[in-house]
């Protein structure tokens, strides 16, 4: 027995190495899987590929900037494009589905903020398991709704392509032609971007917590 900084250390001759995993490289699969998450270049670590600035001042990461841009700029523009498309064509199904998916995204953030505030006041975890699964199903449902709406409006016989083809027959100098084609292109892009963004939000909410559950091997709610 030796001492270092007043802490007793076990004699190395008394340590049974077989009790600690045997030969090198023979760790159980679940331990190797868990330890892989602590690598500096792990794909699942959000800061693994971040470039830290030389100064010590706190800065926003690129993920935060993209989130703020999507939350405050991109999604409102998508709603404006859907509204203009409805006003020009009178087709209500696809714009309504896109608007519902975007509004549902904002509602989930409001619910999460409210639950976070209430549960912190009560000294509880932010999200319970039923709330987590409910929000996961809700976000997944809004993503599917946005995808089906974008696909139906784009490829239906009287949908977006038909509207574009009809307005392309107008004279090139007609201002209605330019306006209609511009709104149609903006609406088509906004519908597919909204669908992709809805799937990204659903996957980001679910997979991060599912991954943590797999790593810790215990149910988590946050």
From Swiss-Prot:
Membrane topology of the entry: Multi-pass membrane protein
Entry annotated with the keyword ATP-binding: no
Any single GO BP term: viral life cycle
Role played: Plays an essential role in egress of virus particles from the nucleus, cytoplasmic envelopment and virus-induced cell fusion. Forms a functional protein complex with gK and this interaction is absolutely essential for their coordinate intracellular transport, gK glycosylation, expression on host cell surface, and function. Together, they modulate gB-mediated virus-induced cell fusion and virion egress and therefore actively participate in these processes.
Keywords in alphabetical order: Host Golgi apparatus, Host membrane, Host nucleus, Membrane, Transmembrane, Transmembrane helix, Virion
InterPro entries tied to this protein: Herpes_UL20 (IPR007629)
Record protein name field: Protein UL20
One Pfam family, short name: Herpes_UL20
Family in the record: Belongs to the alphaherpesvirinae UL20 family.
Subcellular location field: Virion; Host Golgi apparatus membrane; Host nucleus membrane
Assembly mode: Interacts with gK (via N-terminus); this interaction plays a role in the coordinate transport of UL20 and gK to the trans-Golgi network (TGN), and is required for their cell surface expression. Interacts with gB.
GO CC annotation, single: host cell Golgi membrane
Ranges that cross the membrane: 64-84, 98-118, 131-151, 180-200
